[in-house]
Each structure stands twice: as structure tokens, then as C-alpha cells.
Amino acid sequence: MFGVLNSSDHRAAVQQRNIPAFGRTSFELWTDSPTSNHRCETGGNGRDSGQNRVRRPMNAFMVWSRDHRRRVALENPQMQNSEISKQLGYQWKMLTEAEKWPFFEEAQRLQAMHREKYPDYKYRPRRKALPQKSDKLLPAASSSTLCRQVLVDEKWYPFTYRDSCSRAAHPRMEDHLSSSQPVNIANSLLQQEHHYCSTSLRDSPETLAMHLSADPPF
């Protein structure tokens, strides 16, 4: 049922397949490949597989650089496509208006043919992908004032504290709220908050000096 492939024929076929295409530049190899042609027709990433993407008509620079790009690629096989584009852009700027005029006329002719062939064509540039937003929340400022409510005997009492004192006052608040205390616990919590704030200020001499300078004189 299956034919036997001779080992010498198989070896010759493999060697012929692996022979590089000498004399052809990287630019010609790129444009001759079917994937590159499909990439050009679909706009760069091959997404429009269902319907062909209509290419834009060439402008004057593209008409001029069509032949010059091939010439530069043949003279410099190792040069990358981006470097060739930079060199062609520099050469195009050095041309005079009289030298550029024939290419402008050719570009206008191609644009007129394009309008006749695709009367409903509209250029739709691809939108750049937006960067993903980070889910991390920004840290709050150290001087921001946070407001909480204290539940005491089924009544809510507003309780305000600053970030510098929250680490010391908040655990004590939870301890007191977990046990059943009379209604005047809110006053004791406020006193404890003032005590912890003054303790934290006493630990740092610089902060204490700033605090004393901010107090009004008696």
C-alpha cells in the first residue's frame, strides 16, 4: 500500500530543501513569502482573515522609495529594514521640488485609480492597545483624616482620627468595643486617642518641636 522511499532520494530531497536562496536579499525574501503578503494585505497582524483589507494608495514618497528600497537592499544585504527606511527618508528630504514633482504626479494618478476602484473606501487606522489599569490602590496621604463611627449600645457615634494615631488607637478601640461597656466609652476612647497621639509626638523630637511651634501662645 505504501511505496518505499529510497534513502538516497530522501537525503537529496532534504539537502535541496535546506539550500539557502543565495543572491536574494532579506527584503525580497520577506516580500515573497506568503505570510508577509498576507500581513501586508491585512494591515500587519493577519486579523482580517474573513475579509481582505484594502490597502491605502501610495503617496509620493512611497512611489519614489519603491525602486530605491530594492536598490539599497541589494547593495547592503545585511542592513535591516528600519535602517533602510531611515536612509531613504534622508535621501528624500535632500531632493528638490522639481525632482519630487514626477512622483507627486504618479501618486495623484494612483489615488484617482484607487477612488474609482474603491469608491466607498475610508481610511480606518488601527487603534493602539490601551495599557491595562492596575488594580492596586494608591496609598493615602499621611496627613489625611479618616472618619469612622463607633457603635455603642446600638447607637452610632462619629469618631475621627489621623493616620499617625490610627495604628495605636484602632486596636484599643476594637478591644473596648468587643466587651460590653457603658455609653461613656466614647469619651474614654477619645481620651485614649489623645494620649496615644501625644505619646507618638513625644517619641520624635522634631515632630514635637513642630507641634509646639504650631500651638498658639497663652
Curated annotation (Swiss-Prot):
Protein name as catalogued: Sex-determining region Y protein
Q: What does this protein do?
A: Transcriptional regulator that controls a genetic switch in male development. It is necessary and sufficient for initiating male sex determination by directing the development of supporting cell precursors (pre-Sertoli cells) as Sertoli rather than granulosa cells. Involved in different aspects of gene regulation including promoter activation or repression. Binds to the DNA consensus sequence 5'-[AT]AACAA[AT]-3'. SRY HMG box recognizes DNA by partial intercalation in the minor groove and promotes DNA bending. Also involved in pre-mRNA splicing.
Which Pfam families does the protein's record reference?
HMG_box
Any one GO cellular component localisation term in the record: nucleus
Which InterPro entries would you find in this protein's record? HMG_box_dom, HMG_box_dom_sf, SRY, SRY-related_HMG-box_TF-like
* Family of the protein in this entry: Belongs to the SRY family.
Spell out the subcellular localization from the entry.
Nucleus speckle; Cytoplasm; Nucleus
Q: What's one GO MF term for it?
A: RNA polymerase II cis-regulatory region sequence-specific DNA binding
Q: Sorted alphabetically, which CDD domains does this protein's record hold?
A: HMG-box_SoxA_SRY
Primary localization: nucleus
PANTHER family on file? SEX-DETERMINING REGION Y PROTEIN, SOX TRANSCRIPTION FACTOR
Binding partners and assembly? Interacts with CALM, EP300, HDAC3, KPNB1, ZNF208 isoform KRAB-O, PARP1, SLC9A3R2 and WT1. The interaction with EP300 modulates its DNA-binding activity. The interaction with KPNB1 is sensitive to dissociation by Ran in the GTP-bound form. Interaction with PARP1 impaired its DNA-binding activity.
What is the organism field in this record?
A: Mirounga leonina (Southern elephant seal)
Q: Which UniProt keywords apply?
A: Activator, Calmodulin-binding, Cytoplasm, Differentiation, DNA-binding, Nucleus, Sexual differentiation, Transcription, Transcription regulation
- What PROSITE patterns does UniProt report for this protein, alphabetically? HMG_BOX_2
Xref: SUPFAM superfamilies: HMG-box (SSF47095)
* UniProt record, GO biological process: cell differentiation; male sex determination; sex differentiation
For the region Disordered, give the residue spans.
Answer: 33-53
DNA-binding stretch(es), residue numbering of this chain: 54-122
